Design a protein with these regions (language model features):
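C-terminal alpha-helical cap/extension of soluble enzyme domains
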Residues: 192-213
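Acidic-and-aromatic substrate-binding clefts and catalytic sites of carbohydrate-active enzymes
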Residues: 15-30, 48-57, 79-86, 111-116, ...
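Hydrophobic faces of well-ordered beta-strands that scaffold small-molecule active sites
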Residues: 16-18, 39-46, 71-75, 104-106, ...
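Active-site acidic/histidine proton-transfer and metal-coordination neighborhood
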Residues: 50-136, 211-215, 219
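Structural motif
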Residues: 10-11, 67-68, 154, 189
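Generic structural signal for well-ordered alpha-helices
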Residues: 4-6, 28-35, 58-65, 88-96, ...
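N-terminal pre-domain/capping segments
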Residues: 1-66, 129, 166, 213, ...
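Acidic/histidine-rich catalytic cores of soluble enzymes
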Residues: 15-16, 95-178
Length: 226
């Protein structure tokens, strides 16, 4: 992973959202290279769980985050509604174990207890929005984007941009109206937070990394334009 950082910078990316499994299982030398280049690691993308029995994984992630000092950490809660209070208690304890200036960014992914915007708004209502933010996925679904911004506007701090299929290629004029509509919602809400190109066209079993990267650069240019 570290070998890509200079190329990312050269091609106009401000930093990287570092996938947890590109760091924790990496050899010590690679971890040290990433720590040395930590200013390039804007977001740490974690897959820890928040059930009581997952405390060891949370501790390992907290140690990695302390070493890397990212501006934020992306996470998700679990999908068991009966464990809502347990997840919340462990989330708050985990926040205390992280650097004080590290923002906690909930992806509110499908299949989790916070996949609905109104549920996420209620869960975070009494927590500091500067510390406890959310991630919104932006593509061609303007109505979905509007719902998240309307419910959690002051808490939206990070965007995941997914342009996976050919219908999401911003270089094709016919695709632009739907894509532009989604980003118009973002602009209308005065968003000034960070953006990650999460997935681009070409991912799959027979994927070509150079093709995917070229597409990601196309997506980057589009996001900067709109």
């Amino acid at each position: 992973m570290s070998a890509w950082l200079s190329r990312f910078a050269r091609d106009g990316f401000d930093g990287v959202e570092l996938w947890e499994f590109h760091f924790l299982p990496a050899e010590k030398a690679e971890q040290e290279r990433l720590v040395t280049a930590a200013s390039s690691v804007a977001i740490y993308n974690s897959y820890v769980g928040f059930a009581d029995e997952e405390a060891e994984a949370r501790a390992a992630a907290a140690e990695a985050i302390t070493r890397l000092q990212p501006r934020g950490v992306k996470y998700n809660l679990g999908g068991d509604a009966s464990k809502r209070d347990e997840y919340r208690r462990n989330l708050l304890a985990w926040a205390d174990a992280l650097p004080a200036d590290c923002r906690l960014l909930c992806e509110c992914h499908g299949g989790t207890i916070l996949e609905q915007a109104e549920d996420a708004a209620a869960f975070f209502a009494d927590l500091d929005p500067a510390r406890f933010g959310v991630v919104v996925h932006v593509s061609g679904d303007a109505a979905g984007t509007e719902k998240w911004f309307s419910e959690l506007n002051g808490r939206v701090q990070h965007l995941h941009v997914q342009m996976r299929g050919p219908e999401s290629d911003p270089s094709v004029a016919a695709n632009r109206p739907a894509l532009d509509a989604g980003f118009a919602v973002v602009k209308a809400h005065g968003y000034t937070g960070s953006v990650a190109i999460e997935f681009s066209r070409g991912i799959g079993r027979d994927e070509d990394i150079e093709e995917i990267y070229t597409n990601a650069c196309t997506d980057l240019a589009y996001v900067r334009q709109v």
